[in-house]
């Protein structure tokens, strides 16, 4: 088995870390839903199901004007290539097989903002 394939297989079977940023493949989508290969934040690892809840990131900084978004700066901790916006309103469940590698992790203040937005969104 090629080394890259083995590495991807091993990652999909390991424990994901919550509030870490990973590269994910969201495939193709319709409308305004984020797709393709992009960074995303794992907010909840559902390891017993081999799934996780993620928030996709976009490098389109104009997205900040939308509700339920958080700016994620390019820092040593996040290890992003450029400043990005977390699209909290587009959180979704994906199979762990769609995750290819760890990029970085969020700062505590960013985690707090995201948790507050999720609570506000789902206040039923």
PLM feature spans:
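Short, charged beta-turn/beta-strand-edge "cap" motif at the junction between a beta-strand
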Residues: 27-31
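C-terminal terminal-subdomain/extension
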Residues: 1, 5, 9-14, 75-124
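Loop/turn positions that initiate beta-strands
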Residues: 18-19
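Compact nucleic-acid interaction/catalytic patches
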Residues: 32-37, 42-75
């Amino acid at each position: 088995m090629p080394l890259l394939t083995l590495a991807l297989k091993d990652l999909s079977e390991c424990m994901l870390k919550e509030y870490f940023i990973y590269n994910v493949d969201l495939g193709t989508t319709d409308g305004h839903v984020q797709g393709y290969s992009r960074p995303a934040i794992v907010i909840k690892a559902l390891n017993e199901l081999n799934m996780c809840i993620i928030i996709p990131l976009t490098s389109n900084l104009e997205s900040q004007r939308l509700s339920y978004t958080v700016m994620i700066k390019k820092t040593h901790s996040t290890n992003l290539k450029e400043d990005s916006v977390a699209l909290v309103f587009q959180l979704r469940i994906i199979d762990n097989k769609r995750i290819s590698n760890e990029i970085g992790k969020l700062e505590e203040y960013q985690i707090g903002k995201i948790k507050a937005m999720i609570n506000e969104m789902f206040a039923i």
